[in-house]
Amino acid sequence: MLIPSNRTKRECILSRLCFLVLSVWVSLPSAAQNNPYKIDDALYPIYQRASKQARQQEGLLVADTLYQQALKLGDKKAQCLAYIIPLQFYISQKDDSKIEKASTDLKEISRANNYLQYYYHAWSSEIIYFLNQQRSLLALQKAEKMKKQAFADRYPYGIFSCIRTMGHIYKSRGNFDLSAQYYQEALDYMLKNMPDQDPSQLYSSLAEYYRNTQKDYATALDYCEKALKSAKTERNIAQAMIEKCLVLFRQGRIDEFNDCYKEAVQMADRCKLSASVSLLIAHISKNILDKQYEQAHAHADQLSEKGLQQHAYIYECAKDYPNAIKYLKKYHQQLDSTNNLLQLSDIAELNTQIGAERLKMENIQA
């Protein structure tokens, strides 16, 4: 059972009703697998519903039904997918202890059923959660454990996930050079060992690095073109197109930028990428070209970490140099504050771990 054993009576009734309703879909055995996840077609609608409700308590009930029906049909992959839902739910609730349990449960069934991609999905989900919580030291430590296991398994997807995750971690810590090294290593590993996978996101990440950090726009544009050629989904094509817009803007190729921007915005709307940081910066670039500085500032307000930097750039383009200097100073103060908080977070995490280890030793000696 995927839902906690201490459920309320109401939850038990809901679970039974959910089971009865959804069982209609899987009343007849089916071996067809004409869906993206290659699970039994009778189970796929249940998974879709569970996935859509993954942030709600009801999602746990649907996941429980999915698991029970997957057991009946002997679909081991669907059983693993059912265990992903509780992990997603508890991550949305920011419940560390239940996240740990849900992750462990997913790892165990994935290994038992020989679907190791979901074993490493559990690791990656935990790591990204801790990164979003500004607990990058813990994320880094978990990534190291994940790496050891991936190499022990000799599992290409696991090894690739570890390398890419290290890139995410160092990017979140502001070490963009080391992050890019890991992204390049992950890309090389994917192209060699997983040629059927989509490398476009890594190409786009490297394009961003060369655009932002190295100011090497020719190399950045080359990575954008590779991303566009290799992308297998419209969403990844849109992300690569947005990055290409930003490079063209920096190169001063305005006519090409305008054409690229128009196409990128249309694709982003279809893929619901409105909150994308890169897209917001592309909007700001277009506003600056059209001298729509108020709209540019409104877009910059939607950015968290890069907002102050963009405000400074907009004021500079508008030739309002006093405000440009003012916001640039604020941006650098924000960077210093973020770095200090990161160090304090690392120290707090270390102290917690040392305290836990000391308590273990005291219990052993007692």
Mark where each language-model region is:
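Hydrophobic positions within repeat-based interaction scaffolds
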Residues: 37-44, 301-366
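N-terminal leader/linker segments that initiate helical-solenoid repeat arrays
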Residues: 30-84
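Structural motif corresponding to the intra-repeat A-B loop/turn of tetratricopeptide repeats
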Residues: 53, 73, 93, 113, ...
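Residue register of alpha-helical TPR repeats
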Residues: 41, 81, 121-122, 161, ...
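Amphipathic alpha-helical segments of tetratricopeptide repeats
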Residues: 64-68, 104-111, 144-151, 185-191, ...
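Residue-level recognition of tetratricopeptide repeat
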Residues: 48, 88, 128, 168, ...
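"A position-specific structural signal for the A-helix of alpha-solenoid helical repeats
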Residues: 45, 85, 125, 158, ...
